[in-house]
């Protein structure tokens, strides 16, 4: 319980600190060229590990990737059976909601403006947690993979 509260508070403070730095737009923050990755420490109960990878070129966001990988290195966004099952059950699937989350972030320039995607509530929270970590590293130039405690 203590761990959950600690993680929640850390996320809230990090979100506040990062969004405070960005003001209204991402591009108001000085970003260091490089590729920055944040990923969860553990695979989830379904065998996936979420990650975000941000690439900065000439001080600007060039690319943002949000996906999940299994122990064999397969991407969730490319798993056809997972897509079919999820789309039938909740009306969305990883490649679709990943793109939506990334576009919301890039268009608004603010993590706090990213809305929950229906059918992908957990993934939305995971995206927000991981993008905060990746963007913080992009401001400091730390290109080491940021390992983040899974949200429980």
Whereabouts are the PLM-identified features?
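Positively charged n-region of N-terminal signal peptides that target proteins for export
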Residues: 1-4
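C-terminal motif of bacterial Sec signal peptides marking the signal peptidase cleavage site
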Residues: 16-20
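Alpha-helical transmembrane segments
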Residues: 11-15
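Internal alpha-helical transmembrane segments of multi-pass membrane proteins, especially GPCRs
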Residues: 6-10
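Active-site- and interface-proximal helix/loop "cap" or "latch" segments in soluble metabolic
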Residues: 26-152
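Bacterial signal peptide processing site
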Residues: 22-24
């Amino acid at each position: 319980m203590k761990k959950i509260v600690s993680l929640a508070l850390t996320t809230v403070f990090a979100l506040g600190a990062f969004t405070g730095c960005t003001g209204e737009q991402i591009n108001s923050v000085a970003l260091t060229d490089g590729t920055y990755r944040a990923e969860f420490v553990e695979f989830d109960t379904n065998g996936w590990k979420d990650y975000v990878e941000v690439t900065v070129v000439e001080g600007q966001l060039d690319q943002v990737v949000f996906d999940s990988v299994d122990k064999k290195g397969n991407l969730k966004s490319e798993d056809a059976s997972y897509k079919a099952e999820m789309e039938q059950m909740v009306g969305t699937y990883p490649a679709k909601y990943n793109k939506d989350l990334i576009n919301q972030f890039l268009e608004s320039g603010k993590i706090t403006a990213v809305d929950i995607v229906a059918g992908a509530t957990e993934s939305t929270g995971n995206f927000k947690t991981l993008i905060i970590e990746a963007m913080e590293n992009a401001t400091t130039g730390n290109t080491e993979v940021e390992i983040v405690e899974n949200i429980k």
